Amino acid sequence: MGRPLLNRRLAAFGTTIFAEMSALAVRTGSINLGQGFPDSDGPEEVREAAVRALRDGRGNQYPPGPGIPELRTAVAEHQQRWYGLSYDPDREVLVTAGATEAIAASLLALLEPGDEVIALEPYYDSYAACIAMAGGTRVPVTLRPDTTGPHPAFRLDLDELRAAVTDRTRLILLNTPHNPTGTVLTREELAAVAELAAERDLLVVTDEVYEHLVFGTAHTPLASFPGMRERTVTIGSAGKTFSFTGWKVGWVTGSPALVSAVRSAKQFLTYVSSGPFQYAVAEALRLPDSYFHSLREDLLAKRELLAAGLAEAGFAVFRPSGTYFITTDIRPLGETDGFAFCRALPERCGVVAIPNAVFYDHQDQGAPFVRFAFCKRESVLEEAATRLKGLKVS
């Protein structure tokens, strides 16, 4: 055949780095701190709720297209409980097959070919693919490493964000807490985004799946700012908050017009999914505050454990304000190429990580940065830290 089989919009996207590195972990028997999935299940009562639904025959056949009423109501209650945001479960909440489908459906629904999408770089790799599938053009605004203060972090340059907007800009794709850097945008930064969106009549799709994984600060939804509820699609997920990533239950909240548009695209993707698990997630969202507090405290302890181990091994460490990922700089180890470093790491010390360069349009900007996940058991993190000590430059 003379014509390439793969659609030209996807030609630049091969096998994801997560598949490559996870396969490498299996082949070498390494500790996988690359892909962000926990190595233990979430709350027992939530798992049992799924079992009950299966046994009772609830959700074993096609659930309603927008999601079961119980889950849509629970999502609306969650947004009111934590953020004071009021959503109509029937018109302003849509259940999706995880957050990734929510992102894809939102972009497919809201973009015309040639529309520009501003995204904070580095970004979750599916953003670029979803923008491409929708025929959009991605415009990165790069979070820059700042090591001048006592707490190194990646920061947003608001002037750069404003300069990225053109007459072709349709929407901003926002992620806070941010994967992979762990940055949590401040109220001042979010207010500036809201002001810019209103001034230039932009939509915002905001990926907030790490909303409950924040340390020493509070998550603030963009939709809570004046005028933003009507122009913001907010995406949430059960996988990160409840440690059931395999269930693939996500959701969208927004105005009736926005949710209706996203549903129009979503219905031709999976249409429905995760029937019995939807009942379980509805119960999970109503867990007491103590669960969410314990989740943060547990992850904070794990963050400190792994961060200390990485620092001792010789990495420069960016302690995240949110998510369960730590970005490191490998240059103090005498390394500059994150790809080569991560591909060699399993053989060198039996640990798998992800090169941040895959999250950049211009990969040289992310070349020295490597991401580690700390959503693992403490014993696993301790063993990983021990193995990594062998890397330190003497």
Which residue stretches match the model-derived regions?
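Structural signature of PLP-dependent enzymes
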Residues: 262-266, 284-309
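Conserved PLP-anchoring active-site segment centered on the Schiff-base-forming lysine
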Residues: 109-131
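Active-site phosphate-binding strand-loop segment of PLP-dependent enzymes
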Residues: 139, 143-216
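N-terminal small-domain helix-loop-helix segment of the aminotransferase-like
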Residues: 7-98, 105, 157-160, 284-287, ...
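Helix C-cap/helix->beta junction micro-motif
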Residues: 28, 134, 199-200, 313, ...
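Active-site PLP attachment segment
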Residues: 225-261, 273
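Conserved glycine-rich beta-strand-loop-beta hairpin in the small C-terminal domain of fold type I
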Residues: 282, 298-307, 317-330
